[in-house]
Structure formats: C-alpha cells, structure tokens
C-alpha cells in the first residue's frame, strides 16, 4: 500500500509546484515583459493616482459626464458582484426595465423622440462594460455640452477621438470608452466641482 501512496504524493507535490507556481509565474513574467500595460490591468493614471481601468466600467451619474451602460453588478459597477441579469428576452421584468430605462434616458437627455440604442437600456453579460456604442454616446452629447457650457461639436470630437473601430474591421462593433471620454472632457473643459463621482 505504501508503495502506491509515495508516487501519488510525489506527483501531487510535483504538479502543485509545476502548475501552481512555476507555470503561473512564467506566464505572468512573460506577460509583464511583452504586454506590461495589459498585464497590469490597463490602468489609467492621472499623475501618480490610478483613476480606473480601460477594461472595467465605472458609474457616472452627473449630467456633465457620459453615462455607461446599465449595470446590475451591485451599486455602482461593483466588480465583486459582476454578473448578467439572467432575464430572458420575453421576461416581463426585462421588458419593464427596458421601458423604464428608455423613458429615463429620454427625460435626462431632453429628447422625447430619441431612438434609444440597445446598449443604453440593457446590462451586459458582466455588468462591468467600460464601453458604449457611438450611438449612445451621440445621444448624450447635447446633455454633456449643455452641462459644461461647451459646444456640442467639441463633445462629438472627443467622442470620435475615443471611438475604437470593430476589431480587425469586422469583428464586433465600434465602441466608445466612457472613462477615456470623461477624462478628456475634464482635461479640455474642466468644471468647477470636484472631478469624478
């Protein structure tokens, strides 16, 4: 019996060291060397302070900022509560949420005739999307410009500068990073209140 336990124990120790220590450290080391920004979380800095990540959404509620997609990840894009809504397309609760969100967006942006993009009223699979569609960003441009007392064309220019095309030109859709736009707005057209919520 002991002759079977010894090889099993040695295998356990060997594979634990190999796959629990050596492999992760090797992959992390290679990633830090080849892709240092991405391996560190694609963090965005203002001076020496981290203000967010290009990969994780943040909640913005003030009128002078672009607003992200709705999130069901806790209160205010809580990464520890990341999950989808799990509501099917015919679920009455989803229909009610979408209807209420669309009405709120029309009021907030003072446009009762606005065509509301799907990403403006539906949560993503993770609930932490950092990006919105150019259509949703465009819908918010007038509100942001008015709140900052700046020309709408300047908001549209900042949105265009922060719009990424579809991957390889055909995979996915163009997208706008909300945090990048909001930081650019603060840099070019500062407001008198403390930055960021």
Curated annotation (Swiss-Prot):
Major subcellular site: membrane
Pfam families from the UniProt entry: KdpC
Protein known as: Potassium-transporting ATPase KdpC subunit
UniProt keyword annotation of Transmembrane helix present: yes
Taxonomic lineage from the root: Bacteria, Pseudomonadati, Pseudomonadota, Alphaproteobacteria, Hyphomicrobiales
Family: Belongs to the KdpC family.
Keywords: ATP-binding, Cell inner membrane, Cell membrane, Ion transport, Membrane, Nucleotide-binding, Potassium, Potassium transport, Transmembrane, Transmembrane helix, Transport
Bilayer-crossing regions: 7-27
Alphabetical list of NCBIfam families matching this protein: kdpC, PRK00315.1
Location in the cell: Cell inner membrane
Topology relative to the membrane: Single-pass membrane protein
Quaternary structure and partners: The system is composed of three essential subunits: KdpA, KdpB and KdpC.
Entry function: Part of the high-affinity ATP-driven potassium transport (or Kdp) system, which catalyzes the hydrolysis of ATP coupled with the electrogenic transport of potassium into the cytoplasm. This subunit acts as a catalytic chaperone that increases the ATP-binding affinity of the ATP-hydrolyzing subunit KdpB by the formation of a transient KdpB/KdpC/ATP ternary complex.
Cellular component per GO, a single term: plasma membrane
Any one Gene Ontology molecular-function term assigned to this protein's record: ATP binding
Keyword ATP-binding belongs to the record: yes
């Amino acid at each position: 019996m002991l002759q079977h336990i010894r090889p099993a124990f040695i295998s356990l120790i060997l594979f634990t060291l190999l796959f629990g220590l050596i492999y992760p450290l090797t992959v992390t080391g290679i990633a830090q060397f080849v892709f240092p920004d991405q391996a560190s979380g694609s963090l965005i800095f203002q001076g020496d302070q981290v203000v967010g990540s290009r990969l994780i959404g943040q909640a913005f509620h003030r009128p002078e900022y672009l607003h992200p997609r709705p999130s069901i990840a806790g209160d205010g894009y809580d990464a520890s509560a990341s999950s989808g809504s799990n509501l099917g397309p015919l679920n009455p609760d989803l229909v009610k949420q979408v209807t209420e969100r669309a009405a709120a967006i029309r009021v907030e942006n003072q446009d009762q005739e606005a065509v509301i993009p799907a990403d403006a009223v539906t949560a993503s699979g993770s609930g932490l999307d950092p990006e919105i569609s150019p259509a949703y960003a465009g819908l918010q441009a007038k509100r942001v410009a008015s709140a900052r007392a700046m020309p709408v064309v300047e908001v549209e220019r900042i949105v265009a500068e922060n719009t990424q095309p579809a991957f390889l030109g055909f995979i996915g859709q163009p997208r706008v990073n909300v945090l990048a736009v909001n930081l650019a707005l603060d840099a070019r057209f500062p407001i008198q209140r403390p930055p960021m919520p």
